[in-house]
């Protein structure tokens, strides 16, 4: 046996270590490979380029509200294929597929809880559920959120992420634009704050109704916000749109939104704004997540 064969015979091949699926992910913007757990701790914001990735509705609400205070509302409401709609696929099959993929019954999740101890009702869209499209259940859950805010005499916060009205429900989905807007009029009559947070993307019938009706309309950085998409507009007007058209930075320059807030700063910023609007003490940034419950503001101010 030659010397090289003796060396080869003593070499033990090593097994390739298998990496569990989902441990690593890639940034949609800069392409940087990121550790999944680190990204979740950073609220789905890329630590390299500050790109705000899409966030599930439940993760968003859990990152906003105080621990142990969350109570889900309207979870019993489920969509039905009343029209027996079919395009390339049956609507009921699309619903079943979306429900299996996301674990949600529909595209809006509503919870009540506390924010730095202040009672609030919060709603968030699940974009992975049929593009966050608004159907009858989304409208009904949003109205339920408004009714709960009125009952508890507390503010309402909604995080929008939607492609617009759900075409599979035809006019029933379009009716939700008026239904949700009418419900918000009751909030205005009572003098209760409604803050709309626009995330990427907020389009179509959602942007044309409750998403732009906030007492404050706040957007995340670089969120796409509008009615029709930029490609549709370019094809219609036959002109090239300006850079960044329909992005939150473009909209704030034109006065269409009130402010842009980075996601890691969103919780404290919302609490600070609502404390001022509700005449409550400013939140303590060092306070534990469970907070200290503040009693609801009475319906009427005491007479002087």
UniProtKB/Swiss-Prot annotation:
Residues annotated as binding Zn(2+): 27, 30, 46, 49
Biological-process GO terms, alphabetical: fatty acid biosynthetic process; malonyl-CoA biosynthetic process
Oligomeric form and interacting partners: Acetyl-CoA carboxylase is a heterohexamer composed of biotin carboxyl carrier protein (AccB), biotin carboxylase (AccC) and two subunits each of ACCase subunit alpha (AccA) and ACCase subunit beta (AccD).
The UniProt record lists the keyword Cell inner membrane: no
Function: Component of the acetyl coenzyme A carboxylase (ACC) complex. Biotin carboxylase (BC) catalyzes the carboxylation of biotin on its carrier protein (BCCP) and then the CO(2) group is transferred by the transcarboxylase to acetyl-CoA to form malonyl-CoA.
Zinc finger (C4-type) in chain: 27-49
Source organism: Shigella sonnei (strain Ss046)
Region (Disordered), start-end ranges: 285-304
Alphabetically ordered keywords of this record: ATP-binding, Cytoplasm, Fatty acid biosynthesis, Fatty acid metabolism, Lipid biosynthesis, Lipid metabolism, Metal-binding, Nucleotide-binding, Transferase, Zinc, Zinc-finger
InterPro entries recorded: AcCoA_carboxyl_beta, Acetyl_CoA_COase_Trfase_b_su, ClpP/crotonase-like_dom_sf, COA_CT_N, Znf-ACC
Cofactor binding notes: Binds 1 zinc ion per subunit.
Catalytic activity: N(6)-carboxybiotinyl-L-lysyl-[protein] + acetyl-CoA = N(6)-biotinyl-L-lysyl-[protein] + malonyl-CoA
Protein's name in the database: Acetyl-coenzyme A carboxylase carboxyl transferase subunit beta
Xref: PROSITE patterns: COA_CT_NTER
Compartments where found: Cytoplasm
Domain CoA carboxyltransferase N-terminal span(s) in chain numbering: 23-292
Cellular component GO terms, alphabetical: acetate CoA-transferase complex
Entry EC no(s): 2.1.3.15
Functional pathway: Lipid metabolism; malonyl-CoA biosynthesis; malonyl-CoA from acetyl-CoA: step 1/1
Domain of life: Bacteria
Family: Belongs to the AccD/PCCB family.
Cofactor: Zn(2+)
Biased amino acid composition, Pro residues: 295-304
GO molecular function, one term: ATP binding
One matching Pfam family: Carboxyl_trans
């Amino acid at each position: 046996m030659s010397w090289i064969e003796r060396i080869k015979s003593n070499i033990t091949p090593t097994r390739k270590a298998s990496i569990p699926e989902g441990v690593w992910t890639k940034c949609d913007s800069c392409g940087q490979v990121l550790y999944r757990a680190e990204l979740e701790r950073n609220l789905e914001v890329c630590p390299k380029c500050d790109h705000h990735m899409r966030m599930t509705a439940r993760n968003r609400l859990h990152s906003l509200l105080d621990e142990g205070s969350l109570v889900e509302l309207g979870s019993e409401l489920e969509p039905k294929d009343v029209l027996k709609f079919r395009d390339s696929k049956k609507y009921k099959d699309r619903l079943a597929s979306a429900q299996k993929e996301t674990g949600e019954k529909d595209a809006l999740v509503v919870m009540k809880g506390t924010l730095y101890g202040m009672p609030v009702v919060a709603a968030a869209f699940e974009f992975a559920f049929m593009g966050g499209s608004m159907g009858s259940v989304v409208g009904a859950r949003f109205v339920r959120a408004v009714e709960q805010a009125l009952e508890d005499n507390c503010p309402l916060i909604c995080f929008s992420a939607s492609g617009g009205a759900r075409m599979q429900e035809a006019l029933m989905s379009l009716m939700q634009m008026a239904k949700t807007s009418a419900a918000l009029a009751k909030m205005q009559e009572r003098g209760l704050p409604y803050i709309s947070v626009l995330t990427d993307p907020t389009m179509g019938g959602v942007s044309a109704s409750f998403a732009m009706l906030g007492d404050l309309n706040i957007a995340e950085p670089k969120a796409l916000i509008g009615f029709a998409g930029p490609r549709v507009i370019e094809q219609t007007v036959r002109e090239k749109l300006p850079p960044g058209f329909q992005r939150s930075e473009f909209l704030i320059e034109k006065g269409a939104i009130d402010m842009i807030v980075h996601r890691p700063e969103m919780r404290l910023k919302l609490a600070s704004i609502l404390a001022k609007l509700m005449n409550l003490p400013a939140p303590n940034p060092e306070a534990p997540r469970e907070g200290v419950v503040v009693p609801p503001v009475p319906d009427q101010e005491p007479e002087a």
